[in-house]
Amino acid sequence: MASLSLAPVNIFKAGADEERAETARLSSFIGAIAIGDLVKSTLGPKGMDKILLSSGRDAALMVTNDGATILKNIGVDNPAAKVLVDMSRVQDDEVGDGTTSVTVLAAELLREAESLIAKKIHPQTIISGWREATKAAREALLSSAVDHGSDEARFWQDLMNIAGTTLSSKLLTHHKDHFTKLAVEAVLRLKGSGNLEAIHVIKKLGGSLADSYLDEGFLLDKKIGVNQPKRIENAKILIANTGMDTDKIKIFGSRVRVDSTAKVAEIEHAEKEKMKEKVERILKHGINCFINRQLIYNYPEQLFGAAGVMAIEHADFAGVERLALVTGGEIASTFDHPELVKLGSCKLIEEVMIGEDKLIHFSGVALGEACTIVLRGATQQILDEAERSLHDALCVLAQTVKDPRTVYGGGCSEMLMAHAVTQLANRTPGKEAVAMESFAKALRMLPTIIADNAGYDSADLVAQLRAAHSEGHITAGLDMKEGTIGDMAVLGITESFQVKRQVLLSAAEAAEVILRVDNIIKAAPRKRVPDHHPC
């Protein structure tokens, strides 16, 4: 019998790459920890910002401390790093805030796992311990949650505190009170629906952030056509996505040969008649306002003006979609059956000035909760970051209106969970207890990083905070204004229960997924097949 060759056999295509066992695990740990280190300096009320500069001729500049935005705009090649980037994006989509916290917690868990594996503790043992730790942490968080949903005054104060806590780590922190009030008023107008599409945010250069305001209505950043009414009461609105520029022949590759200018005039006349018929079909809907996503050329604009109809062109797709939502209409593309088209309505449409720009204001819209937040600022970067910050606050508030449970911030919740996990580890025999203790240590790293970013002695503060929780002061947290331990209930540093819960579960799941990896296989790049049949 022939002996088997001991030479390694490569079963992959040429160009494919494979990392095995410790090499694969180390590669995953390094990538994930690097992502955590990248964003951890942005954590907390005194976190730093990042400048993101895209390459190319039209290099865009972005200044932000939003974890999801940073990770979304950096290109990562490491598979484990991509897992954390995707997790951060999901956190942003689900609850709107906690994107940096979830990334940092997952990275710290993997940092702890790296040292445990170096001590010859099996990944499955670590995962088993982490699952028990996650369960204990979630129960501790749930038991500490406070629900003021039935008390209107206290719930309103909770919303103000949550918005203030969310904005305290953002660019808007210096105008926190102003924007907290704006965000809470806007979300309470939704009457519990949580439909953030009804809140429109417009950015206008000029003035300062303090000049931003909430407008009870809908603002469209467009201009009304020439020689048309600038104000309409009891508006009936047809919202359309149709071509109103057919003053040219639109047959691909067509050519027309004429032997006189009279023939050219005939073609133009035919085109005008065709457009006139289309405008007449639109006017049969009994409207006094026509809003089109596409361009409206001069001739149809004149026809609308002569009929006393306000025509608004080039309302971008997002604007048209939101306008259909708030006015109660539907977007139409054909106009042969007026009875099938649902028109939008509002009490008043008028042109208004903001700074040096003209906008169209819709008031008394069908969707009564619709409103617009107008952001003012000195530079485009400030406006963009203000919009991102406000979006986070609005998402968290909408989530809190649905689930009114709140927990305390300032590292209080993390220390509370860490204390519960440590107590469980002390009662658990075997190596799983070591994994549980590592989970608690990772949770304690969040208040440590918050204190470090503020320039305080994190070792001293976290030791004091840990001692306070051990003595039963479950509302103790970090007061980053004074650099001491404070009572979060008194300071009003409150966060949404759903945000904290999502941070805990997402980070634990992502860390577990990465820890399970013992092989990374990169597929061979696809080769281009030469085209043997050129056109």
From Swiss-Prot:
It holds the Pfam family Cpn60_TCP1. There is a cross-link at residue 248 (Glycyl lysine isopeptide (Lys-Gly) (interchain with G-Cter in SUMO2)). The modification Phosphoserine is found at residues 3, 260. InterPro entries: Chap_CCT_beta (IPR012716), Chaperone_TCP-1 (IPR017998), Chaperonin_TCP-1_CS (IPR002194), Cpn60/GroEL/TCP-1 (IPR002423), GroEL-like_apical_dom_sf (IPR027409), GROEL-like_equatorial_sf (IPR027413), TCP-1-like_intermed_sf (IPR027410), TCP-1_chaperonin (IPR053374). ADP binds at residues 44, 98-101, 168-169, 410, 495, 500. The modification N6-acetyllysine is found at residues 13, 181. Its EC number is 3.6.1.-. It catalyses: ATP + H2O = ADP + phosphate + H(+). Disulfide bonds: none annotated. Signal peptide: none annotated. One of its GO terms (molecular function) is ATP hydrolysis activity. CDD domains: TCP1_beta. Keywords: Acetylation, ATP-binding, Chaperone, Cytoplasm, Hydrolase, Isopeptide bond, Magnesium, Metal-binding, Nucleotide-binding, Phosphoprotein, Ubl conjugation. It comes from the Eukaryota. Mg(2+) binds at residue 97. It is found in: Cytoplasm. GO terms for cellular component: cell body; chaperonin-containing T-complex; microtubule; myelin sheath; zona pellucida receptor complex. One of its GO terms (biological process) is positive regulation of telomerase RNA localization to Cajal body. Component of the chaperonin-containing T-complex (TRiC), a hexadecamer composed of two identical back-to-back stacked rings enclosing a protein folding chamber. Each ring is made up of eight different subunits: TCP1/CCT1, CCT2, CCT3, CCT4, CCT5, CCT6A/CCT6, CCT7, CCT8. Interacts with PACRG. Interacts with FLCN. Interacts with DLEC1. Interacts with SVEP1. Belongs to the TCP-1 chaperonin family. This is T-complex protein 1 subunit beta. It comes from Mus musculus (Mouse). The gene is Cct2.
